Amino acid sequence: MLKGTFPIAKFQELQTPFYYYDLSLLQNTLDVIRNEAGKYGYNVHYAIKANANPRVLELIARNGLGADCVSGGEIQAALNAGFPANKIVFAGVGKADWEINLGLDNDIFCFNVESLAELRVINELAGKKDKVAPIALRINPEVDAHTHAKITTGMKENKFGINLSLLPSVFQEIKVSPHVKLIGIHAHIGSQITDMSAFRNLAIRINEIQDELEQVGLQVENLNLGGGLGIDYYHPNHLPIAAFDNYFAVFNKLLQLRPGQRVHFEPGRSVVAQCGSLISRVLYVKEGETRKFAILDAGFTELIRPAMYDAYHRIENISSDEPVELYDVVGPIC
C-alpha cells in the first residue's frame, strides 16, 4: 500500500484494527497480469488462500482470472464471487468427501490430485454420480525454491505432491479408474520466491518429466506450474507490482510445449499482497529500562506471519510526519 494514498479522515471514524484494500492498485496489478500472461496465452487462476475478501474476489473474477481453491469453502467463495466453475481448480492434500462432491456437482475445471489414496476416493465419488472427474497429478519435482523452509513445497520431504518414484503405480491406477480422466500435471514449489532461477529450474524439470511421460505413452493437455512469485516487502512503495513480466517470460523461454498444450499458473500473494494494509492505532506508549514500546490494538490475531516465521512487514506512521524514533511495536497478545 502506497503511503500518502490512505484516506486518513475516513479512518478516524472507524474502529481499529481493520484491513484496508486499495482496489485501484489491485486493478493495476490485474491489468499487468492479463497483459503479460496474455502475450503467451497463459491461463491464470488466483490462489484464494492469499485473500478471500468478497470484494477482492469479485474484482479478480470480473477481470477474467480463474480460481485456485484448497477447500470447499474456497470453492463456494469463488462461485459466489462470480468465478466460472470451468476456471476453478481444486488443490490441497486433505480434500474431504463433501468438498470433492462440491467440485463434482459444479463441474469444476480440474482436481489437482496429491496422492494415490485421493485418486481412489475421487474415482469412487465420481462413480456414484456417474461422472468423470478431470484430474491433474500434482508431482513433487524436487526443485529447491530458495525460500523460507516453512513455505517450501516442492521437495521430497514436503507433504505436498506425488513423488516421482510413485508415478508408475499412479498411472496404473488411472488405467483401471473409469471415473477419472488425466488432463494435466501440476507442480507448485513454494511461496515468496524472488530468485528466478528456481522457476527456470522448474521449467527444465517439467520438460524432463514430460519426456519421461512420453516414454510410457502419456501426454497431457495441461501444464499447471502453480504460483510462488514473491513481492518486495521492504520497498513496497517502489515496487508495488510484482515482476510478472520476468516470471512469465522465464516459462515462455524454457518450456517445451507439445502441440495444443495449455499452461496454467496459480499466483496468490503476488496478486493481492501489496494492495492490502492492516490499520491499527497506538493505545499506549510505554518506556522500559532498556527499550520503548508502542502498544497497538492489533496483534498476531490480525497478523500472525511475523510471530510464526519472522516475516517482515513494513510499518508506517500514516498520521504523523514527526522525526522517527525507535520503538518496539507490539500488540495486546502475550
Predicted regions and their residues:
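A charged N-terminal "starter" segment
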Residues: 1-133, 172, 176-181, 211, ...
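Charged (often Lys/Glu-rich) extended helix/loop segments that serve as interaction or gating elements
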Residues: 5, 261-334
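Active-site beta-loop-alpha junctions enriched in small/polar residues
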Residues: 24, 47-53, 70-73, 93-95, ...
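Hydrophobic "anchor" residues on beta-strands that sit immediately upstream
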Residues: 45, 134, 222, 262, ...
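Short, solvent-exposed amphipathic alpha-helical segments in soluble enzyme
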Residues: 61-62, 126-129, 153, 279-281, ...
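Structured core elements
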Residues: 66, 89, 110-112, 136-138, ...
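Solvent-exposed alpha-helices and their adjacent loops that cap or buttress functional pockets
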Residues: 80-83, 104-105, 127-131, 150-152, ...
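Active-site loop/helix belt of alpha/beta enzymes
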Residues: 141-284
